[in-house]
């Protein structure tokens, strides 16, 4: 099944992290509270009994000579009547699963090729044309000297004589235990490539159109990125993404966010405006939360018992006017069972107290004399989200638990430039303990 009106692919994959000028807090400097469980059992209540304000405004909740902490936050809680813990099991990407997903982009697997060390004749000819054009340019327009270009051209003409006409078809065997990026295959449509690769011990899969994804709201320094015309409505994009996700080998995934973005090919030969439709693992209206790559997730301890055994289950679907042009699937899992009893949550007033205390712990290192010359930092909490967060099951690497959590999104502002570094702190909604939704090494302990 094809989920594109006119498939658009690109040459290569470029991963770009757009960082603010203000640097995030060094992990080695963070002080962590010693009390993992913050409240007594008799103070807890179910989600239906929990009283939660819509906003939290508190100026100067903590002030010192080196930092000021405040809150001006909206509080986002889905309309749910119950909340239960979930046990999920790993669902790594093996070859048969990858093929099923790949077939949503191509007519059949014969269109997918292995990446060869040797370029094809067509690829070499395209490179020759590009370098000859550069050679014909004026000297000030060239990136290299004529001698350097001619050396490259001579090598390309030599390789052209023995270059294969086509690439080998198929996909490479995927080593699900690989800790880094692992190439699987590529397909060519409209003379552009899309690369299929895996990451994170077989728990994530990217079918990525080439280029850099820039989200609306990106601060260029002299202006904010605004994306107006994508060519389809948000509802049309949602319908296309829903049909695509319904064909994936997944369970209990629901749309949790929509973002406008643009895909920029590195040489700026094309810009594709698109919607990024975000799906999270969901049960009875409560979902995992995607905070995006722009946020710094601060650690709890070096070997946190609340650290994630694999990434949160999140699917990003890239939809342009041509349909689905790519997807990223992190932390694939399947629901094993749902707890029969409802979660007992600490009151939100105690969540606020826990946030105040942990923020103070987190930035107390700035009082040290060695930071005397650093400008004061303003820390402002601007959003709090309620959702599931992944945590480990002690002694079982194939299982994980999804528990309710508060995602506290905030910014660090440095006076010297006024720019804010985004960060997020995650608190267990049942205990108030810090959580760490990042993938960690096997030697870190996990929660029971």
Q: Where does each model-flagged region fall?
A:
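Short, solvent-exposed coil/turn segments at beta-strand boundaries
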Residues: 192, 200-203, 317-325, 401-403, ...
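Segments that shape or occlude catalytic/ligand-binding pockets
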Residues: 238-416
């Amino acid at each position: 099944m094809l989920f594109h009106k006119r498939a658009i692919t690109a040459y290569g994959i470029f991963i770009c992290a757009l960082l603010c000028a203000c640097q995030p807090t060094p992990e080695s400097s963070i002080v962590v509270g010693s009390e993992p469980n913050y409240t007594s059992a008799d103070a807890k209540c179910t989600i239906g009994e929990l009283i939660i304000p819509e906003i939290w405004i508190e100026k100067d909740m903590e002030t010192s000579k080196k930092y000021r902490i405040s809150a001006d936050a909206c509080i986002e809680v889905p309309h749910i009547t119950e909340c239960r813990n979930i046990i999920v099991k790993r669902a790594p990407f093996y070859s048969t699963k990858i093929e099923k997903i790949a077939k949503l982009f191509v007519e059949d697997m014969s269109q997918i090729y292995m990446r060869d060390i040797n370029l094809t004749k067509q690829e070499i000819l395209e490179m020759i044309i590009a370098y000859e054009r550069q050679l014909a340019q004026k000297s000030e327009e060239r990136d290299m000297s004529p001698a350097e270009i001619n050396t490259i051209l001579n090598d390309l003409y030599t390789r052209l004589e023995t270059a294969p006409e086509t690439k080998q078809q198929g996909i490479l065997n995927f080593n699900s235990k690989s800790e880094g990026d692992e190439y699987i295959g590529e397909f060519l449509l409209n003379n552009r490539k899309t690369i299929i690769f895996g990451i994170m011990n077989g728990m994530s899969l990217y079918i990525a159109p080439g280029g850099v994804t820039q989200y609306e709201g990106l601060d260029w320094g002299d202006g904010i990125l605004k994306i107006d015309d994508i060519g389809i409505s948000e509802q049309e994009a949602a319908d296309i993404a829903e049909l695509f996700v319904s064909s994936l080998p997944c369970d209990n995934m629901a749309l949790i966010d929509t973002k406008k973005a643009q895909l920029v090919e590195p040489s700026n030969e094309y810009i594709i405006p698109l919607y990024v439709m975000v799906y999270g693992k969901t049960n009875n209206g409560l979902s995992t939360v995607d905070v995006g790559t722009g946020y710094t997730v601060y650690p709890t301890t070096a070997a946190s018992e609340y650290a994630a055994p694999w990434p949160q289950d999140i699917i990003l679907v890239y939809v342009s006017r041509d349909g689905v042009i790519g997807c990223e699937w992190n932390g694939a899992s399947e629901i094993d069972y749902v707890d029969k009893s409802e979660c007992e949550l600490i009151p939100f007033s105690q969540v606020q107290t826990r946030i105040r205390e942990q923020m103070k712990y987190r930035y107390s290192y700035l009082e040290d004399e060695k930071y005397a010359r650093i400008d004061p930092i303003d820390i402002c909490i601007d959003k709090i989200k309620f959702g599931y967060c992944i945590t480990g099951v002690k002694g079982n690497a194939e299982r994980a638990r999804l528990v309710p959590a508060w995602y506290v999104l905030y910014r660090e502002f440095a006076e010297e430039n006024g720019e804010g570094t985004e960060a997020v702190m995650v608190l267990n909604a049942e205990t108030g303990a810090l959580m760490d939704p990042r993938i960690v090494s096997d030697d870190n302990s996990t929660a029971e």
